């Protein structure tokens, strides 16, 4: 494991969050995918494991296509300098489709990032139960008037 200072990890997370926020606003996930090393590994408990930046890029672009308005606000963050890790809980959040001031539709996710240095991440793992939580949340959002921007392009590899 690589040791990184807290300041370096905080800066890396700031860059990661900015790239993710840009992708959420524009639908272009390339800037976010470029934050991973060429040999990065992304472990996604419902969709499977993706090895390499280009496989991560292809997956994230397809999986996020139906949800251009989804955001990922963080509830808490922990920095592990000894292991170069950043852990956080975020919400997978869709805005209320009929009432801008209404409650969002969301479910929690724990993420573990491993920082490789030089502004790149070697690993990300998302821990949640999308087969249960995502289905319920998206169904409720659609029932409230939400519309998918595209059809689903990726099937879950693991289900309840």
Regions found by a protein language model. Name each.
Residues 1-34, 38, 155-160:
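Short, low-complexity N-terminal intrinsically disordered segments enriched in polar/charged residues
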Residues 13, 53-56, 106:
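A structural signal for well-ordered alpha-helical scaffolds and beta->alpha junctions
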Residues 29-84:
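A solvent-exposed, acidic/Ser-Thr-rich amphipathic alpha-helical stretch
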Residues 22, 42-45, 97:
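General structural signal for alpha-helix termini and helix-helix connectors
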Residues 2-7, 61-160:
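A beta-strand edge to alpha-helix "cap/lid" segment located at domain peripheries
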């Amino acid at each position: 494991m690589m040791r990184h200072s807290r300041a370096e990890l905080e800066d890396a997370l700031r860059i990661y969050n900015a790239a993710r926020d840009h992708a959420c606003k524009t639908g272009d996930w390339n800037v976010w995918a470029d934050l991973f090393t060429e040999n990065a590994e992304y472990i996604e408990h419902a969709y499977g494991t993706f090895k390499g930046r280009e496989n991560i890029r292809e997956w994230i672009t397809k999986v996020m296509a139906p949800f251009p308005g989804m955001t990922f606000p963080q509830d808490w963050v922990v920095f592990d300098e000894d292991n170069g890790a950043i852990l956080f809980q975020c919400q997978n959040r869709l805005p209320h489709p009929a009432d801008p001031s209404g409650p969002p539709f969301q479910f929690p996710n724990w993420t573990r990032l491993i920082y490789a240095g030089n502004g790149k991440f070697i690993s990300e793992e998302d821990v949640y139960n999308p087969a249960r939580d995502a289905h319920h949340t998206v169904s409720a959002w659609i029932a409230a008037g939400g519309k998918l921007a595209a059809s689903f392009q990726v099937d879950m590899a693991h289900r309840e």
